[in-house]
């Protein structure tokens, strides 16, 4: 029975993701569509395009909005959304994140093409969940470029778990610092549920591949990398000092796109910026990367563009 004397629904008792959510009591972040009122360098592109921004785990709307502002000041509409972290589901890629909040906003820009800005693996999981939704499976076919910040990675199990442990600690820093003993016990229980689900997910992927299955069917890194409708233009921002999403798998990802899939790739690898902190430390390079992506898209749709 809960505190009101009512029984918990049976489904809540058997779902690792629900156990994680109950332990951490995570708030849902609203998805936001902003119509740019600015007359910027890319206002003409705004007639045909919108920027979709998927945030990193633990980010608040204020932090993600700073990146939306970069596009809105250039004259472009944006949709921004950060999905909740959740325990891994045995249902696989289609249930990695709950994306219902963003559906009505995507419907409002249904007639526009997209440029995507993806942050960390939480953004990748959000993207993969969207692509597995029947109504939005086409999103890559209407996307002209993707900017990747601190992602994507395909980590080995141990660094994978260590990275997630750090992410969870960062997300729930206040609980660790000032929570009651009961809060901290609940936190540890929730974290164990999450990390256990990550181990089970790694085992599920290993069994799938070992029995002849394609890893792109179970692993988001390869699902995106090998997706037949993946757009041709990509910009990467990552760092050799990022301990959460380390540089080697990101480098392997963009090199594969360049060498095997013959796509247009710009890679910006820094040596001093931590996870999702490349813009604060390297604002000039970051803005230039955004401009080059948007200019490339603009010239394709507006051949007479002087940008």
Q: Where do the model's predicted regions map?
A:
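Active-site nucleophile loop of the alpha/beta-hydrolase fold
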Residues: 145-156
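Active-site loop->helix "elbow" adjoining a glycine-rich segment at hydrolase catalytic centers
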Residues: 119-123
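Catalytic active-site module of serine/aspartate enzymes centered on a nucleophile-bearing elbow/loop
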Residues: 281-307
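Serine-hydrolase catalytic core
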Residues: 187-285, 289
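Catalytic nucleophile-loop/oxyanion-hole region of alpha/beta-hydrolase
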Residues: 84-108
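Short, surface-exposed "cap/lid" segments of acyl-processing enzymes
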Residues: 30-87
């Amino acid at each position: 029975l809960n505190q009101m004397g009512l029984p918990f629904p049976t489904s809540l008792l058997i779902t690792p993701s629900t156990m994680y959510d109950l332990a951490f009591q995570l708030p849902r972040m609203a998805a936001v569509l902003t119509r740019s009122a600015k007359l910027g360098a890319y206002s003409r592109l705004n007639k045909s395009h919108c920027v979709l921004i998927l945030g990193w785990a633990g980010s608040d709307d204020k932090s993600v909005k700073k990146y939306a502002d970069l596009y809105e000041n250039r004259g472009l509409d944006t949709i921004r959304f950060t999905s909740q972290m959740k325990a891994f589901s045995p249902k696989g890629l289609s249930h990695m994140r709950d994306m219902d909040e963003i559906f009505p906003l995507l419907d409002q820009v249904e007639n526009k093409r997209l440029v995507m800005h993806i942050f960390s693996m939480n953004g990748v999981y959000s993207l993969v969940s969207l692509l597995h939704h029947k109504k939005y499976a086409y999103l890559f076919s209407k996307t002209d470029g993707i900017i990747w910040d601190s992602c994507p990675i395909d980590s080995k199990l141990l660094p994978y778990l260590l990275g997630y442990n750090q992410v969870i600690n960062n997300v729930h820093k206040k609980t660790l610092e000032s929570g009651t003993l009961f809060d901290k016990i609940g936190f540890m229980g929730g974290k164990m549920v999450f990390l256990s689900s990550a181990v089970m997910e790694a085992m599920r992927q290993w069994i799938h591949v070992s029995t002849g299955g394609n890893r792109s069917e179970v692993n988001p890194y390869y699902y995106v990398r090998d997706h037949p409708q993946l757009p041709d233009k990509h910009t990467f921002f990552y760092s050799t000092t990022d301990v959460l999403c380390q540089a080697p798998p990101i480098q392997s990802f963009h090199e594969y796109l360049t060498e095997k899939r013959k796509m247009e790739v710009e890679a910006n690898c820094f040596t001093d910026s931590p996870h999702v902190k490349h813009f604060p430390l390297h604002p000039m390079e970051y803005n230039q990367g955004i401009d080059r992506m948007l200019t490339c898209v603009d010239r394709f749709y507006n051949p007479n563009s002087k940008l």
